[in-house]
């Protein structure tokens, strides 16, 4: 579990995250963190948070968001809200590091998801795109199914297809989650 003031870094995506308020701080109501995204930083691809709303408040720099087919460019002082269930992705839209305050409502296990992605990146268990390698993706998708899913194919199809690979990964000693002390910045 993450703690307030903890900072993690994902060297593949270019994300540096400082947890401001965790699920424990807010009784699960929200997770709040400050995201610094390097000039070439981006999330691995389009995704959906089935049960969570994400609120992005740009503090410095420029961010580019895709919400469905809609492109939004947000600069310092602007906010973008992604409703639960909405396909989206984001990237730094400028030449300088962007700084964004992010709120995720409700928190669920999003902080654990973020810590896990950082650890996977540090351990070389992700592809160049930032997506976990298949064996780790199978575990990740099953573990964090309330927090994130691919926009297509339908979630039940993905779960069914990855179940055998997840079982194999567990049999080989791989974990779906990582320690409470993830890659520090």
Q: At which residue positions do the language-model features occur?
A:
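Jelly-roll (double-stranded beta-helix
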Residues: 1-30, 41-52, 57, 62-185
């Amino acid at each position: 579990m993450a703690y307030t003031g903890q900072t993690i870094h994902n060297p593949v995506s270019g994300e540096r995250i400082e947890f401001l308020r965790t699920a424990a701080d807010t009784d699960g109501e929200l997770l709040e963190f400050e995201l610094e995204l390097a000039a070439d930083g981006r999330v691995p691809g389009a995704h959906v948070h089935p049960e969570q709303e994400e609120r992005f408040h740009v503090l410095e720099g420029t961010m580019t968001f895709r919400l469905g087919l809609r492109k939004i460019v947000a600069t310092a002082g602007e906010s973008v809200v992604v409703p639960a269930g909405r396909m989206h992705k984001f990237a730094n839209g400028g030449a300088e590091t962007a700084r964004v305050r992010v709120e995720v409502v409700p928190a669920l296990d999003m902080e654990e998801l973020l810590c896990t992605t950082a650890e996977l990146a540090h351990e070389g268990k992700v592809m160049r795109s930032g997506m976990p390698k298949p064996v780790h993706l199978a575990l990740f998708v099953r573990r964090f199914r309330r927090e994130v899913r691919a926009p297509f194919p339908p979630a039940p199809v993905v779960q069914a297809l990855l179940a055998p690979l997840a079982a194999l990964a567990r049999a080989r000693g791989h974990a779906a989650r990582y320690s409470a002390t993830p890659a520090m910045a």
